[in-house]
Swiss-Prot record:
Name of one Pfam family that matches: Formyl_trans_C
Native source organism of the sequence: Chlorobium luteolum (strain DSM 273 / BCRC 81028 / 2530) (Pelodictyon luteolum)
GO MF, one example: methionyl-tRNA formyltransferase activity
Enzymatic class: transferase
Domain of life: Bacteria
Entry protein name: Methionyl-tRNA formyltransferase
Length: 314
């Protein structure tokens, strides 16, 4: 089976390694990824994508693509004569590309479809407080994340698990799912099921606007919002006119839920930092003030020593 693998971030690397090590009968003829770019900062030297780096370590051929809609890219894919195209955290492909695979093209998506279709499924699942997540493989079609499902793998989600931690776990669960999907296709046993549109939900791209904390929410919702965006891009708020990223929080059941303090109020108790929601408090554990490095709460507190209700997060 001639396999064309497409992916970019660290999430896709375990799947690439699994496919490359699939054994006799499976050949990765090319790895397609994005071009080298500055990744540490705008002025840093260009670096390869995690997928490119892994592919080179595995001795695989790499094709860097800027524009997947370029007809020349579709021609290159067709010339490779792939039996299957495997896509993991890449881009939206045109029909001329995904239609070039003899046995079909499938995508690895980090949710239990049809839930959380879109660019940020892991983040949105955690932000909603879901206690179960997983991955889905499905055949590509023109509408994004709507294709026929090949298989799913589910996993429970910890109450304090953040997006970075869950993404790492799902990357390895996804690698097993990709390999199982390839074997099903190779053996002609890839039975598919339609997605139930009545159960569909969206996971839109994360922006500056939709990652800002609204303190007029319950303490549980605030904790879920923060862990759903940790460590990147991170939930943020403002303090004294400056932006503050909050990377880690925890439930604070020991704090009295009844309080005259408004949502967003800060409280310091024995060097620990708490923020008020509509029905109680959460503890803030790791923060980063604009222009500063990330700090654990005790160090952060020493930097400004607020009173009980001042300053306030907004």
């Amino acid at each position: 089976m001639r396999i064309l693998f497409m992916g970019t971030p660290e999430f896709a690397v375990p799947s690439l390694r699994a496919v490359a090590g699939a054994g006799p009968g499976f050949e990765v003829v090319m790895v397609v990824t994005g071009p080298d770019r500055p990744r540490r900062s705008r002025n840093s030297a260009p670096e390869p994508t995690p997928v490119k780096q892994a592919a080179l370590e595995l001795g695989l051929r790499v094709l860097e693509v800027e524009d997947v809609k370029d007809p020349a890219f579709a021609s290159t894919v067709q010339e490779l004569r792939p039996d299957v195209i495997v896509v993991a955290a890449f881009r939206i492909l045109p029909p001329a590309v995904y239609g070039a695979a003899r046995l079909g093209s499938f995508n690895l998506h980090a949710s239990l479809l049809p839930a959380y279709r879109g660019a940020a499924p892991i983040n949105h699942a955690l932000m909603q407080g879901d206690r179960e997540s997983g991955v889905t493989t499905f055949f590509l079609q023109q509408q994004v994340d709507t294709g026929n499902i090949i298989l799913k793998r589910s996993t429970p989600v910890g109450s304090d698990e953040n997006a970075t931690e869950l993404a790492l776990r799902l990357s390895f669960i996804g690698a097993e799912a990709v390999l199982a999907t390839l074997r099903l296709i190779a053996e002609g046993r890839a039975d598919v099921s339609l997605q139930d549109e009545s159960m569909a939900s969206k996971a839109p791209k994360l922006t500056r606007q939709n990652t800002r904390i609204d303190w007029n929410r319950s303490a549980a919702d605030l904790h879920n919002f923060i862990r759903g965006l940790s460590m990147r891009p991170a939930a943020w708020t403002t303090l004294g006119g400056k932006s503050v990223k909050i990377f880690r929080s925890a439930a604070a059941p020991q704090m009295s839920p009844s309080s005259p303090c408004a949502p967003g109020s800060l409280l310091i108790d024995d060097g620990r930092l708490y923020a008020r929601g509509t029905d109680g408090w959460i503890e803030l554990l790791l923060l980063q003030l604009e222009g500063k490095r990330p700090m654990e709460a005790p160090e952060f507190v020493r930097g400004f020593r607020p009173e009980v209700t001042e300053p306030q997060l907004v």
